[in-house]
UniProtKB/Swiss-Prot annotation:
This is D-alanine--D-alanine ligase. Belongs to the D-alanine--D-alanine ligase family. ATP binds at residues 161-216. It comes from Helicobacter pylori (strain Shi470). It catalyses: 2 D-alanine + ATP = D-alanyl-D-alanine + ADP + phosphate + H(+).
Length: 347
């Protein structure tokens, strides 16, 4: 089976998406037919596999390529010999953050009837906004930490709105990859932390920070009626897993497996199933959990995890191919114009 990897995007996580695509090239050797790059101006470019390395993008060489036009079932490439349709194999949406995870690309791909692996429109909207994610989890009976939602209008009253003691953690509501996230240990650190978070989002979440909390990551997808899970990862971290720890450490290809009981692993999987069904059908996602006093809490849902979390699976290729065979199908609406014909007939 062949794939097309779509990456880039107008997002704070643009470069992370490039790194993910390069990593996926290695994980799916020989299976990726096309690499389609989406730049910050929403132009699509076809990137040769030989150019899928950091130096190429650091030098912005893709700007010399002819842009492509998205159309039904593929991409349109103009040349001196006329327009040519590039028919796309199954697309993997690997655009992190804005464009890829907020629903824009899901809408575009669905509109043009281009099959893809990734979160659909509703799943994107709910998981991209951390506040909505908490409401969604609560409705499903999945626990989440207490929180306060701040915006520019009420930020001046932040200390009065926060109902828990220092330290607490501040994070943008609409950003991933630990961008804009900071731990506030005392009042004098608050303004700087708020300024940093508001650079990435119009709304921010504030949660109690619990020192030494156990954190577990679990990736997976649903293939037909059965779930396929990765192994459980316990990230090596200091206070929290920051941007550098997530993306600038290339010293290992595999994440550390968690040492946990069978009972706890089963709890994580049951919570994952609640969050996945049926909203995320067709996507491979990662759920990040906290365990506090033997209770499982959702930290966040990552609808397009970095490098598609391939490093957490023992057989990633087979998992992805099986998922590709069980994507949800949207029924095509047949337009018969029977109502209009009846009106015309009665005239």
């Amino acid at each position: 089976m062949e794939f097309c990897v779509l990456f880039g995007g107008a997002s704070f996580e643009h470069e992370i998406s490039i790194v993910s695509a390069i990593a996926l090239k290695e994980a799916l050797k020989g299976r990726i037919k096309y690499f389609i790059f989406l730049d910050e101006n929403h132009h699509f470019y076809l990137i040769e596999e030989s150019n899928m390395h950091s130096k190429y993008f650091a030098q912005i060489k893709e700007k010399k390529l002819p842009p492509l036009i998205l159309t039904c079932n593929g991409l349109l490439k103009n040349s001196f010999l006329g327009a040519k349709i590039i028919e796309l194999p199954l697309v993997i949406n690997l655009v992190h953050g804005g464009d890829g995870e907020d629903g824009k690309l899901a809408s575009l791909l669905e509109f043009y009837r281009i099959a893809f692996i990734g979160p659909g429109i509703e799943a994107s909207v709910l998981s991209y906004n951390k506040y909505l994610t908490k409401l969604y989890a609560k409705d499903l009976g999945v626990k989440a930490l207490d929180h306060v939602l701040l915006n520019e209008k009420n930020r001046a009253n932040a200390l009065n709105l926060i109902g828990f003691n220092f330290p607490f953690i501040i994070k943008p509501s609409n950003a991933g990859s630990s961008l804009g996230v900071s731990v506030v240990k005392e009042e004098k650190e608050l303004i700087y932390a708020l300024d940093g978070a508001f650079e990435y989002s119009k709304e921010i979440l504030i949660e109690p920070f619990i020192q030494g909390v156990k954190e577990y990551n679990l990736a997976g997808c649903k293939i037909k009626k059965d779930f396929c899970f990765s192994y459980v990862e316990e990230p090596n971290k200091q206070e929290f897993l920051d941007f550098k720890q997530k993306y600038l450490d290339f010293s290992r290809n595999k994440a550390p497996k968690a040492n946990l009981s069978n009972a706890l692993e089963e709890q994580l999987k049951e919570n994952f199933k609640k969050l996945y069904n049926d909203l995320f059908d067709g996507a491979l996602i990662r759920c990040d959990f906290f365990v506090i006093e033997n209770e499982v809490y959702l930290n966040e849902i990552n609808p397009i995890p970095g490098s598609l979390a391939n490093y957490l699976f023992d057989d990633f290729k087979t998992t992805l191919e099986n998922l590709a065979q069980s994507l949800p199908k949207t029924p095509k609406i047949q337009i018969k114009n029977s109502y209009l014909l009846q009106i015309q007939k009665n005239k």
